[in-house]
Amino acid sequence: MDCINTLFSVTGQDAHAVFREEQMVTVANAFKDGAASYSGDNSANVWQLVLFLRAGYYVQSNHPSDVGQYGQDLATAIEGGLDAFFANAHSKDVSAGNGDVLGEVVVLSDSANEQGRYLDVYKRVLTGYNGSYDAIPSMLAAVNDVYTPLWRGNWNDAYVKAVTADPSIIDTLDSFARDHLDLLGTDKSYLDSNAGMNVGRYVEHQPLQDKVRPLMKGLLDASKITGPTAPLWVTVASQADSYDKGNCSYYGVCNLADQLTKAALPVTHSCDQTHTIKAQALTAADLDAACASLLNQDAFFHKLVKDNGPIPGQYESTVQIVVFASRNDYQTYAGAIYGVDTNNGGITLVGDPTKPDNQPMSIEYQKDPDDGFPAGIWNLNHEYTHYLDARDDMKGDFNQQTTVPDVWWIEGLAEYVSYGYRGVTDDGAVSEAGKHTYKLSTLFQSTYANSDVTRTYPWGYLAVRYMFEKHPEDIANMLGHFRTGDYAGGYAVYNNDIGTRYDDDFDAWLTACASGACSGKKAR
């Protein structure tokens, strides 16, 4: 699987050689043959064929000039494969083996833009769900995968026409959301809230509005803005706000972001004139602990990066720290209130520092179990470092800051300060150091696009720590450029001036780090 997954990043002549239409047709025909004899698991390697086809559609969508056009020959072949798979009785098996393959095939129906053809299949998967699935993660994932074509199909005219002609899929989604309210507040809450979200998504389409509006209102009435049913309420309300805003009073969702903020973040506390916390459930003691940690971090940061204070001409003098009571609450509310992705451990928005009304903020949550951060606020000091770095080291907004490969610095510094300031050993980084996975010169090229979590965070930490301990003058040189907005000049310091010169020394340093040199002492 790992080998096939690498194909999603193929470009250029390789993309044409691997994914041109005749190649895809050959694989689609092989998938059809495998689907006809599918036994309910991956013993015949059907999964690999499906992943290859998904990769082909993905690469062609993103690099059509590399791959070339796809036409009716491929459409016919892929429909034959999908038809054969879904007609096979084993595609209905409730088992770990079938769940793995079924979910991928469902997503393939979306990749191929065949959503309208398989509405009955999607209904079958949703209505088939029952408690027997709960002990089989891959079956739960397969049910959730159905929401991908149902959601993305809304941009496909053929799909919208199919749903308009037979809107029973909307009734299936509504019934799923109503029949499984008991999932809300559990670790399977997403199955129910995603059903409600998809019901609401159809309200964009005028021919479906008379059907969808009362269903949305019914789901809102069956749930509440806070408490265990909030994930359903918020997702449906968000669809009304996005696609039927003119009728907000009918749903009771006018000024939705304000409603959600008042309901979910009732606590407002000023640490001082420039640091404000908005929280869901922090106690007075929690607020005191968080404020003390934030305010004391400034001096530690300044001593480390040796800045001259805030970058002149930027509006980043105040910061708001938003803290939800749990990861579930963060994922329920943060996207709807602030428009952020919540598939992360928190996020910092520096905004547009050229605007006088700019308000940087970090959006976080309390983690259970607590990992030792003040007030249990996960990544509190990591996210606050992002704010300080933007204010004092990196001129411009986030897009300007990332015009060059500098994720090793952005995320590595945040990790290094977070662990060093708290005097905690980064056990994950120490473990990675012993593996010697990356050269320093490779880490210097890290971007959010080419790096996974391990390369971004523990290896970013290691790169930054090494540079501070062994070559602080290079960091000073680099930051001198970053602070004026000269990101190309800063990049040249480590890409051109340093290049590969430190790779051998970094490798030796990693050995020492893994042997105890990277203990929990405070960074200097």
Language model region names:
Residues M1-E22, Y38-D41, D174-M361, L443-Y457, ...:
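Non-catalytic architectural context of zinc metalloproteases
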Residues M1-S249:
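Non-catalytic all-alpha helical scaffold/repeat segments
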Residues L53, S61-G68, I277-L282, P405, ...:
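Extended, non-catalytic scaffold segments that flank or surround catalytic motifs
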Residues Q69-A75, P214-L219, D427-K435, E473-G490:
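Short alpha-helical "patches" and their helix-cap loops
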Residues L119, I136-L140, N144-R152, D157-V160, ...:
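Catalytic domains of carbohydrate-active enzymes that cleave complex glycans
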Residues S168, A289-A292, N296, A375, ...:
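Extracytoplasmic/secreted proteins, especially bacterial periplasmic and envelope-associated proteins
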Residues G351-V430:
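Zinc-dependent metallopeptidase catalytic helix centered on the HExxH motif
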Residues V404-D474, R524:
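Metalloprotease/metallohydrolase-associated module, dominated by Zn2+-dependent proteases
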